[in-house]
């Protein structure tokens, strides 16, 4: 079952019994693809282990381009209120605030309803320990790109394996101020257990679908 890697193509290795799916870009496509897979009558996935993999942005304060991060906290960067930054109070650092709150990073926030997902940290640590000494691909182009981050020592290291929080949002964002917001947002929703290390556009959609599938015993999360 292979046809060029378009969304919802399936790739199966009968020797390793690994089943792969291409979800497509964005939380909506990811949620739809994983829900379709979970409900597909050809597969019994109630005892399957799930690993989410993909390309990501990375915080230069934590790691270099080409590094790989294992995450157990995945935070949604879209579910929020937003006020135009040109109109926010002077003592606010951002116009993003949690739903049901009146100012950014209000400690009295409502219970998460899709804003944060936590995977099994023991599995994350197991995977990290298996791979932490792996030598990653490090072509000369990476060093050239990383050299621009002169104020971030970790960004100039050869690619390496680490652990850290992940933020998923539908907007492809860039910049120091948004980077600072992402760190605070992940720390806020993880209650200080993680900060932003990598960013993507799909993972909270994947987790939401798995959570719903778990309720009908199609998967075990």
Predicted regions and their residues:
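Accessory terminal and edge-of-domain segments that mediate assembly/interaction
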Residues: 1-221
């Amino acid at each position: 079952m292979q046809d060029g890697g378009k969304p919802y193509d399936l790739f199966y290795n009968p020797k390793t019994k690994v089943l792969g799916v291409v979800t497509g870009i964005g939380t909506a496509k990811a949620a739809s693809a994983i829900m379709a897979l979970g409900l597909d009558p050809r597969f019994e996935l109630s005892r399957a282990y799930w690993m989410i993999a993909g390309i990501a942005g990375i915080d230069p304060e934590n790691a270099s381009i080409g590094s790989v991060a294992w995450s157990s906290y995945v935070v949604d960067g879209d579910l929020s209120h937003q006020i135009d930054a040109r109109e926010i109070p002077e003592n606010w650092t951002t116009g993003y605030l949690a739903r049901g709150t009146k100012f950014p990073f209000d400690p009295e926030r409502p219970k998460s309803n899709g804003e944060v997902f936590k995977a099994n940290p023991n599995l994350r640590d197991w995977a990290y320990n298996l791979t932490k000494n792996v030598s990653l691909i490090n072509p000369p182009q990476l060093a050239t790109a990383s050299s621009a981050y002169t104020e971030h020592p970790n960004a100039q290291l050869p690619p390496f394996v680490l652990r850290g929080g992940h933020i998923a949002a539908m907007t492809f964002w860039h910049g120091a101020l948004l980077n600072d917001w992402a760190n605070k947002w992940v720390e806020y929703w993880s209650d200080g257990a993680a900060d932003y290390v990598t960013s993507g556009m799909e993972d909270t959609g994947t987790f939401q679908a798995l959570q719903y599938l778990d309720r009908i015993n199609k998967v075990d999360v």
